[in-house]
């Protein structure tokens, strides 16, 4: 007998039971959360993170509509400051994770979570919290693209990467702010030092962009990172490492999704025949948030009014 043939009362009872079980599970998860981070900013509740991510998605949707009949913002100085600021932030995170894990004697093969208030463990948890915060700051990548009317840069890969990293890392900090979690964050923060250095240099304009021939290798570096993540996590599962299994499987699934998306980006960008200059499509994924030649020409020509309606 199918669900539609069931008595209304039994269907309601089943729905009520499922709802109550969900609520009980939610409450239980909070009993096993990391108590060290309970009072840290943004960690008391998931709603601030969800709200920020929702506002981000709304801006992705509404921002291009608002900018449609406006001149693009010229943001060279802002981009230079922002990108090199992100270099310093990621360098700080990498250093804290490296020094904290080294002093705590962490293993790169298998490391369980230590929820104690040991100075090195708290240092690692703090660095992971800053890593989570940095993913929220990275929402500005998209904001700058839209304000500069670079909407073709705001691809599915771009939005998926930014939105999921910030949201999912809240879960990571709330329950596993240490142990194996340090490895991926340490590797990713190091890669972001290189990436934002590239972005910062690109923001100086065309005179330096011709020397930045190594852009495609940033995408390759990202792909290597995802494969290393899968290999490292699979090894931990094989050795039955006492780290939450759900986190292991979530990391593998997440890395696989990025491999497919970045491979698609890499193939379209570097392996397919190049379009003509007039029809050239800007790249997504790790695309530069610097200043391109067309913006340089605008700056050297008639001054534009940032964000002003066209014709003013």
Swiss-Prot record:
Bilayer disposition of the protein: Multi-pass membrane protein
UniProt PTM: N-glycosylated.
Annotated compartments: Endoplasmic reticulum membrane
GO cellular component: endoplasmic reticulum; endoplasmic reticulum membrane
Pathway linked to the protein: Lipid metabolism; fatty acid biosynthesis
Transmembrane found in the keyword field: yes
Membrane-traversing stretches: 42-62, 78-98, 127-147, 165-185, 188-208, 217-237, 246-266
UniProt-annotated stretches for the region Disordered: 273-312
Keyword Membrane recorded: yes
Signal peptide positions on this chain: none
Stretches with biased composition (Polar residues): 273-292
E.C. number: 2.3.1.199
Residues glycosylated per entry: 20, 292
Effect upon mutating residue 162 to Q: Loss of fatty acid elongase activity
Keywords for this protein: Endoplasmic reticulum, Fatty acid biosynthesis, Fatty acid metabolism, Glycoprotein, Lipid biosynthesis, Lipid metabolism, Membrane, Transferase, Transmembrane, Transmembrane helix
Top-rank taxon, per record: Eukaryota
Catalytic activity: a very-long-chain acyl-CoA + malonyl-CoA + H(+) = a very-long-chain 3-oxoacyl-CoA + CO2 + CoA; hexacosanoyl-CoA + malonyl-CoA + H(+) = 3-oxooctacosanyol-CoA + CO2 + CoA; octacosanoyl-CoA + malonyl-CoA + H(+) = 3-oxo-triacontanoyl-CoA + CO2 + CoA; triacontanoyl-CoA + malonyl-CoA + H(+) = 3-oxo-dotriacontanoyl-CoA + CO2 + CoA
Disruption phenotype: Rod or cone-specific conditional knockout of Elovl4 results in a decrease in very long chain (C30-C34) polyunsaturated fatty acids in the retina, but has no effect on photoreceptors survival, phototransduction, synaptic transmission or visual behavior.
Protein's GO biological process: fatty acid elongation, polyunsaturated fatty acid; fatty acid elongation, saturated fatty acid; long-chain fatty-acyl-CoA biosynthetic process; unsaturated fatty acid biosynthetic process; very long-chain fatty acid biosynthetic process
EC class: transferase
Listed GO MF terms: fatty acid elongase activity
UniProt tissue specificity: Expressed in the retina, exclusively in photoreceptor cells and in the brain, skin, testis and lens.
Domain free text: The C-terminal di-lysine motif confers endoplasmic reticulum localization.
Subunit text: Oligomer.
Function: Catalyzes the first and rate-limiting reaction of the four reactions that constitute the long-chain fatty acids elongation cycle. This endoplasmic reticulum-bound enzymatic process allows the addition of 2 carbons to the chain of long- and very long-chain fatty acids (VLCFAs) per cycle. Condensing enzyme that catalyzes the synthesis of very long chain saturated (VLC-SFA) and polyunsaturated (PUFA) fatty acids that are involved in multiple biological processes as precursors of membrane lipids and lipid mediators. May play a critical role in early brain and skin development.
Protein name in the entry: Very long chain fatty acid elongase 4
Organism of this sequence: Mus musculus (Mouse)
Gene that this sequence comes from: Elovl4
